[in-house]
Amino acid sequence: MTLELFMYLTRIAFNGITGIAVAILSACAAQQKPVELKPEPAAAQQPMTGVQALQRPSETPDKIVNDFYRFDSMQAAAKNGADAQVAQFLSTAQPSAMTESIRTAWLKNLGTRGDVAQFRQQYALLPEAGRDPETKCYAAAFGIEQNSRLLNDVLESGDKLSAGCFLLLQKNIGSVNQSRAWRRVRILLAADQVAYARTLAAALGSPLENTDGAGAQENQLRSVISTAAQKTPQASAVRLQQMAGSLTGEQAGFGWGVLATAYAKDQQFDQALALYAQADRSQLTQEHFDWFARSALRGKHWQTLDSVIASMPESGQRDATWLYWRGRALAAQGHSAEAQALYRQAAQTGRNFYAVLATEELGQRISTQNNAAQASAAQVEQISKDGAVHRALSLFHTSLQNQDWKMRRQAQNEWRYATREMNEPTLLAAAQLAYNHQFYEMAIYSADKTNHLLNYNLRYITPYRDLVQTYSRQHGVDAAWVYGLIRQESRFVMGAQSSVGAQGLMQVMPATAREIARKIGMDSQQLYTMDGNIRMGTWYMADARSRLQNNEVLATAGYNAGPGRARKWQGSAMEGAIYAETIPFSETRDYVKKVMTNAVYYASIMQQPNTSLKQRMGTVPGR
């Protein structure tokens, strides 16, 4: 794409012509116009102010696209330590998400090699906002930064360790609390990071290979907490009981927490609670606490739930999930005032699932009235002139022309880079710009980042409304639910393709499309058109609901994970929010909560009556 063509497309977008020709869309799709964005009258009286005058330098679209085509080779060169080649590329490229990614890969290679001098030089060139945890760990390990909080986070985390963060921990192992250090060894063993665990144990003075002492005990514990052992928790629990006498209380207490969590993830909540009762809470990770709480929640053991949340690390207690459920636990025990205080805290965490539920517990409902005006054409054009924004849009439009999904993902990364330090008025202007270009996923992304200035028309866009409403009516499903699902599935990207092959706006698998096509008299290739994708997706939503006791929550889980799994996760009849929170797959658990939250916001925007999330979640029937 030439610069002149790109600027022409930009100008026509500013003039309100949003039907940019996109090769990957069908002819039908090209005729579909997004619904016009109309701020609420009250907001329209308040002109947008405070939009930043960004002036980052621009490159030509050809230079931007050429850099993209060199990106993979430069990334590989950085990972392999081709210092001169990487340095030459970075010296000729403007700062971008691409250059930050390449520099980050180079820094990790330098860290692995122990080249402190060159690491220091390159680290200084990486902005604070672009530094990931591993590069920060290397910087702290090399003494470039003093970061005691980072060291503590690495020590306390239940996550797998990166090489940089392992180096930081290894270099400081003599100065940390020994009990917490041995706990970290256990966490590594439970995650099968045995080499790291072995190195740490040796640094602590008791190698795992010893025949006695702490290291030998940890190695013995490993046999019942490894990922393989977690797959057979019953047999592993028997072995742990047999060896408990030769372990310390902390070692056995950690082991019980690991196996209890394995039971909980397998939906065996009563067995999980029995093992959690033997666990040492000081040894539990946040993941263990989460499943301990979910196990208590599933059985409505409110007093236990209250106690478990109170035992969590402070960061866990502050999470909206546990603010809300502790409020519910306190309310169930008659502590109304304390519950209300926690609901107020949860309600202030944004517009997430638990913020909405907490708002309703306080006797209120969500509002989708905008408090910010639509950005003016001049303000939007001002944003478009910024070099970083220009780069993202150049890659976006070229990706459409070339049907290059990988390039589109990089365009998304460049948009995140371009907007990461924008203030709220600028974010809303950027969201409008992205919307004008039909870069829908990044319009939503930008609008979602504001906390005070709110434009719900940009947060919850409704493109292709005629098609969505037509097929929603035809298949008897709620259009707000359909929009909520599309927003989560694809962010309205017609060419979206998942890692497992799901396609289009509604992320329908090709095999599923063939089955649907046979049942309703379609050509399965219509999956790749907008009309066909929405028709198939809405039919599948209706089918999932009918197969899952006409329940939207079950159908949403089934749409993501399959009807069989959604059915397996049922027990006796329970509150929909409890069902959602105890789904064992983190992706599906998050998906259900987001789709259902989206649905109530769309219902409000579309002036439908069902705007209560608690009512929409309802009761999930028993199997």
Range-by-range predicted roles:
Residues 26-27:
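C-terminal motif of bacterial Sec signal peptides marking the signal peptidase cleavage site
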Residues 36-40, 61-70, 81-82, 95-105, ...:
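Generic helix N-cap/helix-start motif at coil->alpha-helix transitions
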Residues 74-78, 91, 103-108, 256-267, ...:
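Alpha-helical adaptor scaffolds
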Residues 238-246, 274, 333, 338, ...:
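Catalytic glycan-binding domains that act on GlcNAc-containing polysaccharides
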